[in-house]
Amino acid sequence: MSLSEEQRRAVERTGQDVCCVAGPGSGKTRVLVERFAWLIGDGMDPGRILAITFTEKAATEIKRRLAERFAGQGALRERIEHAPVSTVHGFCATLLREHALDAGLDPGFRVLDELEAETLRIEAADAVLDEWAIGRTREFRELVDAWACENPAAHLRAVHEALRKGGDVGEQLREMGGFDEAGALEFLAAEARALTEIAERNTENRRTKIEAVEAWLGRRGEMDALAWVLDLALNRQGLDKGASAQGQRVMAAKEEALAVLAGSRHQPQREVLRALLLEYDAEYQRRKAAEAAVDFHDLEARTLALLGRDGPAPREIVERYDAILMDELQDTNPVQWRILERLRRPDRFFAVGDLNQSIYGFRHAEPGLFQSYQEKLEAEGREIDRLETNYRSRPGILSFASAVAERSAGVRPHQLIPREAPFAPKPVPVVEIQRFQADPDAGEGASGSEAKWIVYRLEELKRELQVGDPPRPVRWKDMAVLARTKALFGELEAEFAARGIPCAVRRGRNFFDEQEVVDFTNLLRYLASPLDEIALYAVLRSPFFGIGDQEILVERREGRYPPAEAGPVLERLLAARESEPPDRILARFLDERGYLRGCPARVRANAAKFLGLLRTWHSAAPG
């Protein structure tokens, strides 16, 4: 199929950096491949074209398409197969291996996969928290009480990861300032006043909402600052477009003010947390250095530092590329963008992406970077290419998606035009809407009714639908259920299991953050360190024993801690440490407690995976 006119304009644009804003199903990957091929056809050496993607699958697909494109040109195809087409992290790793000494790395460094890195982070966090629990008990308990969470180690790791988004963690923590309460409150008030000034009041609903904001502004100074901020309520539904957008800024300012007020009220704990984070960061770095290893963030940070050095190496790296092609630019994070800025030469950058499709799962992706890039080119009078023809979806799906998206906060307008070629007719509507309400008589919530209906409707569709070319009956693996929140997953799993329908749940969570894995980890932490009160408390509250907070408090106050129903069991486990490997201890314990009995397949699979990891780790480092 030949390129459309809008695709061709993007592929052949010259004399400027290119920004291609591509809607879903509009051929983003094809345009990037064709740009690569067009540059080769224009005489550019494939080895001097750098193409960066965000997944190995995408990089492989680009190379496959290019190889097919030049299938009859042996020598050229071979050069294409060796062209620098890779993920961001693949590119960084290659560059750092070439310049390991300049980057301050062991030339034989290895890259930790996410599971290995997470394991080191868990070990580092546990080690530091154990030291604090024993050596700085009072400060540690005050911090944990203020944190009000069951898993301080997971929270510590999460805060550390968030800080890494901004660069060097130690530098950020050392430069961390105080909280400007007055500034945050004034900014919130200014945003609210701006809303009252621009909002239309031509309906009773609009007038009532804006007058409520004015009344809230009038109460400033009459109540505690935190209570005043919490008192602000604003439903933007029904407001005019400009007021709705400003209302979103008001609520963002409210969240910022709450964060500032909360931080200010916990300043002592904040200082303790800063010290704890610095120790954790140092411990994590030490453990990586001991293995001559780096994680994905290190790849980015060290590449950025390498490109910022004085000397011939950075200049040679920049000069080796005549063109840089970037796929899915909306998934770029700030460090990656700074790497691109140091690599790029003027008018040699080609980027495709869609602000409305950022998947955020790529380490700290910041869609605003793509928006800023687009706005910068527009301010310079450069052309922006827009791909608006959708080749993937039926017109009914596109019109429904557009109707929903245009009312959603943070979604930028982008027209989706269905391709002219008609789809084969379907025996069922392409979009169905079903409304659910809780049934108090049946004692069932809306989610239970919804799960039943979804399973029933999927069974109907499986009997009715034909897919593919040539048509074939639809299979279960052809179907997917998307949920706005994870709350529905349990109901759905139960309904699918009851009907004998196979399903696999993708929760988008880290394996080590799954509740059952947290339970296993807490038990092992306690067995490794019986003085770890946090781990013991979590074990007692978990499904292993199911002891409530009040009972734990009473038992502890009366000197029965651990409580009678848990004490003997835990003593047997502690005794078994001397003669049995941890995976066998945990497996027998799970069997004795009936922990996995009646659990969904996902939980059983996670347990099997965790036990396998334990076996591997213990074999590699027994004891």
Regions found by a protein language model. Name each.
Residues 446-451, 455, 536-582:
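Polynucleotide-recognition surfaces of large bacterial nucleic-acid defense/processing enzymes
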Residues 9, 90, 139-142, 154-158, ...:
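Amphipathic alpha-helical interaction segments
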Residues 1-64, 115, 123, 193, ...:
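Conserved motor-region signature of P-loop NTPase helicases/translocases
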Residues 1-21, 30-31, 48-50, 108, ...:
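Accessory N-terminal region flanking or inserted into the helicase ATPase core
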Residues 86-94, 146-165, 275-279, 297-299, ...:
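Core structural elements
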Residues 35, 91, 95, 99, ...:
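Amphipathic alpha-helical segments in well-ordered regions
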Residues 15, 46-57, 70-228, 294, ...:
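Conserved ATP-dependent motor core of P-loop NTPases, especially the RecA-like helicase ATPase domain
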Residues 106-109, 134-144, 159, 171-176, ...:
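Short coil/turn segments at secondary-structure boundaries
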